[in-house]
Amino acid sequence: MRGILLAGGTGSRLWPVTRAISKQLIPVFDKPMIYYPLTTLMMAGVREILVITRPDDQRQFRHLLGDGSQLGLRLEYAVQERPEGIAQAFVLGAEFIGDQSVALVLGDNIFHGAGLGTRLRQYNDPAGARIFAYVVADPKAYGVVEFDEAGRAVSIEEKPARPKSRYAVPGLYFYDNRVLDVVHGLVPSRRGELEITAVNETYLKWGQLRVTTLDRGTAWLDTGTFASLVQASEYVRVVEERQGLKIGCVEEVAWRCGFIGNDQLRDLSRPLLKSGYGRYLLDLLADHEELKEVKPS
């Protein structure tokens, strides 16, 4: 499976903050926003990832992430000249996807929860499409999915006036390779965009749109407004300070997933020591070595 991280768009809901910088590069507490969706793909076992950016932003993303080799990844980049819908990501990424299945994550969506990576890895070779469902207070503001007890989608609507369920569809999607054919046949919506809901509707018609609920132990944070951005930062701060563990730490996730070894993690920590971020990485290694030295009684 290959991954696409969509970090384009104008970010106009966050202007003037995002007039000169990509939304996905602004901080969510102690990390750039893009670290969080990137680690979501990594936890799903995806190591080949296409990062789609605005033309003016690509240089900064390359400076931050490079080619991904330091994290055991292969990162490539594509430019979104104009934002023409979420499903445009598959048009821009068609050559990168090739004959593989693909996971798409939106660059302003943050997921966190115990066992999330284990669950995501179950779906990294989908037969059809896999979307996720999350209970929200106001489903009218989201894409809404209705599904049966077996996890088969029954209906899906974009911002319905009368929602058929309280389950919103977060910005994380898994598709088999037929998604490229689906997108090729899409007609732009009235707002001139290739809609991700239209992609999902096609799989629904085929009877191959599966739904996994994200339970109450999982947080889904959308950072598209000033208020939600502050809330996301506060959530990350509180969890990290109480648990002593970081959320969305790309170096830690690469290490825990086995993409890099101890020496690579140690090398990555050194330039980050002044902020305390590097000390956290070194402490992970120290704790790991301590556990290895403990002998069973």
From Swiss-Prot:
A GO molecular function term, named singly, is: metal ion binding
Query: Which cofactors does this gene product need?
Result: Mg(2+)
Q: What does the entry's cofactor note say about binding and number?
A: Binds 1 Mg(2+) ion per subunit.
Q: Which UniProt keywords apply?
A: Antibiotic biosynthesis, Magnesium, Metal-binding, Nucleotidyltransferase, Transferase
Q: Does the keyword Membrane apply?
A: no
Where does the chain bind Mg(2+)?
D108, D222
Q: What is this protein called?
A: Glucose-1-phosphate thymidylyltransferase
**Lineage per the UniProt record:** Bacteria, Bacillati, Actinomycetota, Actinomycetes, Kitasatosporales
> What Enzyme Commission number(s) apply to this enzyme?
2.7.7.24
Enumerate the NCBIfam families for this protein: rmlA
Query: Which pathway does it operate in?
Result: Antibiotic biosynthesis; novobiocin biosynthesis
Q: What highest taxon heads this organism's lineage? A: Bacteria
Q: Which reaction does it catalyse?
A: dTTP + alpha-D-glucose 1-phosphate + H(+) = dTDP-alpha-D-glucose + diphosphate
Q: Which Pfam families match?
A: NTP_transferase (PF00483)
Organism this protein belongs to: Streptomyces niveus (Streptomyces spheroides)
Q: Does the keyword Transmembrane apply?
A: no
Report the function annotation for this chain.
Catalyzes the formation of dTDP-glucose, from dTTP and glucose 1-phosphate in the novobiocin biosynthesis pathway, an aminocoumarin family antibiotic that targets bacterial DNA gyrases.
The entry's family comment says: Belongs to the glucose-1-phosphate thymidylyltransferase family.
According to the UniProt record, what class of enzyme is this? transferase
Which GO annotations describe the biological process of this protein? antibiotic biosynthetic process
